[in-house]
């Protein structure tokens, strides 16, 4: 059975960067934007649609709960099924790091999975999204709250689990306190000790 690292993260915490650094240290693939591309190929949906709909419930939890599910699966439901299949197939290929997309839930019974959650305080994340992503559309703090709220709603909707809740992960790390590189080192060391 393959050893997989899943990284869930707050927006702006550097989880994607941590995942890439861990993969580099361990010499294994990291799936983030590559995962979006694979899901888009399998589903026939545009990458931008997969990026948005594949991680967020449109309009939040309530509107999704009240959507047209009575008429059959929604595009989001179809995308969820394809996403789960693609994640499972990647995990079967060999050890890897998978960032986001509820991979921790998808792989909970299918792989030896080290489940990680990366978080940081609001000031660290706000500064980071301005510096790294050039976010300037609205206040960085509001953008962080909105993205995190949508991620949490999506995670709860499809997994019935609380996103970011420490008991749902093997380890949670504060990238603002520890730094991106130290988080990557800790995860890589923990992975090696479990292999």
Regions found by a protein language model. Name each.
Residues 1-9, 94:
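Pre-Walker A (Motif I) flank of P-loop NTPase domains
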Residues 6-20:
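Glycine-rich phosphate-binding P-loop
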Residues 40-95:
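ATP-dependent small-molecule kinase phosphotransfer cores
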Residues 58-65, 77, 136-181:
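Small-molecule kinase domains that catalyze NTP-dependent phosphoryl transfer to phosphate-bearing small molecules
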Residues 84, 180-188:
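Short, amphipathic alpha-helical "lid/cap" segments that border enzyme active or binding sites
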Residues 103-109:
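RNA pseudouridine synthases
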Residues 29-40:
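Short beta-strand-centered segment that lines the nucleotide-binding/catalytic pocket of NTP-utilizing
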Residues 109-131, 137-147:
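Conserved phosphate-donor/acceptor-positioning beta-strand/loop module used by diverse small-molecule
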């Amino acid at each position: 059975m393959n050893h997989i690292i899943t990284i869930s993260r707050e927006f702006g915490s550097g989880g994607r960067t941590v995942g890439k650094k861990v993969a580099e240290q361990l010499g294994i693939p990291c799936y983030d934007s590559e995962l979006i591309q694979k899901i888009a190929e399998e589903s026939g949906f545009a990458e931008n649609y997969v990026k948005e709909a594949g991680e967020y419930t449109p309009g939040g939890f309530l509107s999704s709960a009240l959507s047209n599910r009575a008429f059959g699966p929604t595009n989001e439901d179809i995308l969820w099924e394809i996403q789960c299949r693609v994640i499972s197939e990647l995990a079967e290929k060999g050890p890897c790091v998978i960032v986001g997309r509820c991979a921790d839930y998808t792989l909970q019974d299918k792989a030896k999975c080290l489940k990680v959650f990366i978080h940081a305080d609001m000031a660290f994340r706000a500064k980071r999204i301005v510096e790294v992503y050039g976010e300037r559309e609205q206040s960085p703090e509001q953008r962080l709250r909105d993205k995190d709220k949508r991620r949490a709603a999506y995670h709860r909707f499809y997994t019935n689990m609380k996103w970011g809740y420490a008991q749902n992960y093997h380890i949670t790390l504060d990238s603002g306190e520890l730094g991106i590189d130290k988080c990557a080192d800790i995860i890589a060391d923990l992975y090696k000790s479990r292999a």
